[in-house]
Amino acid sequence: MSLSIDVTSLPSIPSTIYKNESSSTTSTLSGKSIGRSEQYISPDAEAFNKYMLSKSPEDIGPSDSASNDPLTSFSIRSNAVKTNADAGVSMDSSAQSRPSSNVGCDQVDFSLNKGLKVKANLDSSISISTDTKKEKSKQNHKSRKHYPRIEAESDSDDYVLDDSDSDDGKCKNCKYKKKYFALRMRMKQVAMQLIEDL
């Protein structure tokens, strides 16, 4: 079984904001958590502050906000730096400045260049042979010894064993069966005589 996954030839995904003009700013995805920290220090900030301070509070409207002012919004975007959200350390070497003709245009190009290859080889073979088992069973039959069966019959019906005997019938087919029962009868008689004497 072989599995191969190749994602090196994925196309880049451009996202253009405001206009269809191109830009040289490229952001690359990272596995770490990245936040955006905006810096508002720029030459345009001083001019914007003077403009805002020169107007009365009643005259300031939504059109005077930083997001609607092209120069100020451009300076905010151009001076924004990538930071690690956990440590707060800047991850950009320098902020890139753009020409004034690109005010209001921002394009971010996310490119993914990764290679992933997975290979798994599964080779298995199973062979089952029953010939050796048959040979072993034949050898077992040959190795068994057949002893002659000895059968003995009692002359008297008194010597027939029943299931209640204490010896569990271990001497049922014994050649000393007749002598055994005779001895047992004598032992019973002796035991009964002792009980009577006491």
Curated annotation (Swiss-Prot):
- Pfam families per UniProt: Rota_NS26
Where is the PTM Phosphoserine found along the chain?
A: 67, 154, 156, 164, 166
What exactly does this protein do? Plays an essential role in the viral genome replication. Participates, together with NSP2, in the formation of viral factories (viroplasms), which are large inclusions in the host cytoplasm where replication intermediates are assembled and viral RNA replication takes place. Orchestrates the recruitment of viroplasmic proteins such as capsid proteins to these factories. Participates in the selective exclusion of host proteins from stress granules (SG) and P bodies (PB). Also participates in the sequestration of these remodeled organelles in viral factories.
Ordered alphabetically, the record's keywords are: Glycoprotein, Host cytoplasm, Host-virus interaction, Magnesium, Metal-binding, Nucleotide-binding, Phosphoprotein, RNA-binding
Per its Swiss-Prot or TrEMBL entry, what cofactor is needed? Mg(2+)
Q: Which GO terms describe its cellular component?
A: host cell cytoplasm
Q: Where is this region: Interaction with VP1?
A: 1-48
Coarse class of the protein's main subcellular location? host cell
Q: Name one GO biological process term.
A: viral genome replication
Query: Mind telling me what this protein is named?
Result: Non-structural protein 5
Q: Does the keyword Transferase apply?
A: no
Spell out the post-translational modification annotation for this entry. Answer: O-glycosylated. Hyperphosphorylated on serine residues, when in dimeric form. Phosphorylation by host CK1 is required for the hyperphosphorylation of NSP5 dimer.
> Could you tell me which species this protein originates from?
Rotavirus A (isolate RVA/Monkey/South Africa/SA11-H96/1958/G3P5B[2]) (RV-A)
